[in-house]
Amino acid sequence: MKHVNTLLMQELRLLICELKRLKLSAVSDPDFSQEKIHAELDSLLCKLSRHFD
């Protein structure tokens, strides 16, 4: 079980990094559209929900 928790924590850290990157892109890149933000968030939510379904 400890191994599973470690893997889950690693995945959560990666998702947090991706969210931070998305936030920076959305703020700093004027060509970053709402549609792209929504698509990226949907992708991250799918990755996260895999662990809790």
Curated annotation (Swiss-Prot):
What does the miscellaneous comment read?
Gene K overlaps genes B, A, and C.
Gene expressing this chain: K
**What does this chain do?**
No function has yet been ascribed to K protein.
Origin organism is Enterobacteria phage phiK (Bacteriophage phi-K)
Query: What is the name attached to this protein's record?
Result: K protein
